[in-house]
Amino acid sequence: MAQGAVIHVAPEQPTHAVCVVGTATPLDVRGSAPKGYTTFGITASPGVIVDVIHGPPVKKSTMGASKWPLDPELEVTLQVKAASSRTDDEKVRVSYYGPKTSPVQALIYITGVELSLSADVTRTGRVKPAQAGKDQSTWTWGPGGRGAILLVNCDKEDPQASGMDFEDDKILDNKDLQDMSPMTLSTKTPKDFFEKYQLVLEVPKAKMNRVRVFRATRGKLPSRYKVALGPQQFSYCLELPGGQHSTDFYVEGLAFPDADFKGLIPLTISLLDKSNPELPEALVFQDSVTFRVAPWIMTPNTQPPQEVYVCRVSDNEDFLKSLATLTKKAKCKLTVCPEEENIDDQWMQDEMEIGYIQAPHKTLPVVFDSPRDRGLKDFPVKRVMGPNFGYVTRKLYMSELTGLDAFGNLEVSPPVTVRGKEYPLGRILIGNSGYSSSESRDMHQALQDFLSAQQVQAPVRLFSDWLFVGHVDEFLSFVPARDKQGFRLLLSSPRACYQLFQELQSQGHGEATLFEGLKRKRQTINEILSNKKLRDQNAYVESCIDWNRAVLKRELGLAEGDIIDIPQLFKLAGNSRGNSKAQAFFPNMVNMLVLGKYLGIPKPFGPIIDGHCCLEEEVRSHLEPLGLHCTFINDFYTYHVYNGEVHCGTNVRRKPFTFKWWHMVP
């Protein structure tokens, strides 16, 4: 909230003061009253509004002037109607009265100035002049909320640059400028005003490394933008001419919200009195604009696809052809990372997660680069980040990482309402251990802190450490649905698979085999149903999935009708530490690629009944009534045998939400 310095009156000599248009400036009448005086009267020139907060006047004189008692509850404020054309051109006279003394007068000379710091606090995409008396220092959420928004300038307009745009202190061109939030300082003063007064723009020292402010000088060339605030520079003295003047600034974020940074950055303009060189500068007026750094937002499977990413490796040519056909149907771009750039690391989903950031004036896709740093480690930096495509990461020591820090373990739900609480951008889903032990694995706390700090997609922690790889995309997915809910949650289900196989066995199909057409030992339905060890292992897996089912129903507000069980069997295998973890027994169909109504599902190689794979037919029977098209893709030798499937080997850039994140209430 804008604040002016208290004006103290002095009966023995005139007082000179500055009042800013639109701000009520306190006038200390009682503290300066001579001893023995009990009431006062006040008059002002036409350009000054006087407001006395008190009970009714004690006495009204024949001239119409009022008198007020000098009580402790007394409050007097002054407001000027307009900026002064010359110094001291407005006057206020205070008259003190006592029962046994002659009246004493104090004279205050007022200089009115216009001074406002304006930003897009109404979130329209344009800077409007600051409204007098409107608080710009408080940032509020919701459809009626106010407060400016700031983007982290994390793209790279110059492809030849070594880093992101915010990593230097230059503005490259107008495109770079569009990633920043404009701010304007407007002043109107007497011509000689700044001979005795100084304006200073500042940011709290604790936040100067989170923001950079450029001042625009004449012209529009990049060299005409000078750094005013930023790392190592928390204040900036403005040298301004008197009269009416406008100064433009451009503000860029340097850091995303995180555990140690809530995302709020106040920028403050201070007016200082430097008229007496023998005294320190005195604070006359102060106003602030608070920016919030836009959060990084994930996009769920229900958002329309725009681009699919995949790796070319030595033996996945047929997989790539199938994927090309699918992306063509879905009308989205296919980007293939060549072998020499991925170094046999085909796990595109694990390497990165593509989301976006948004301000009223700009939306920017941003890739979140996982800390796993394997063969694909350079792909997000060299092939994804670029002009109008941002980048963020959290660097961690390799010794601190587990498989749960890869981004197959990072998903997001569609929008949900939970016990009356709306999550219009969905909720982030991450996998952790169900309980702590010396062998348990969790997503690194630094990653969890970053995701939680974004505020708009409150994370839900699931139990995934029971899996060999340990990722949530191994047992869940979401698909769009043409109904009020708008989606279905898909969960892998050993129970559903056993029920299907038992039904087929009862129909006389017990000798039908899995893995037909593969160089792999075939197993009949009868053999699978009679394998007690496999049944026991899948009973354990089912208990783990059921635990997550309950969490998802509670935290996403789902009913059983919102969930589809996808038949799937698992087997247990020892990991590097000798602990038993679950792997997919046949290609894991829930680990699918969702491109609108087109689904790329791992081909399960289930038993063939009447010329059709019974597992494929079962999945079609659940998904095609929703208007979805199922394409089963053979990923057996290129992905499945390495503990991954179609989703693990691909990544998708999706269309941002139409819902504006600042309209929600976290």
From Swiss-Prot:
Binds 5 Ca(2+) ions per subunit. This is Protein-arginine deiminase type-4. Substrate binds at residue 374. The gene is Padi4. It comes from Mus musculus. The active site is at 350, 471, 473, 648. It is an enzyme of class 3 (hydrolase). GO terms for cellular component: cytoplasm; nucleus; protein-containing complex. PANTHER family: PEPTIDYLARGININE DEIMINASE, PROTEIN-ARGININE DEIMINASE TYPE-4. Ca(2+) 2 binds at residues 155, 179. Expressed in pluripotent embryonic stem and induced pluripotent stem cells but not multipotent neural stem cells.
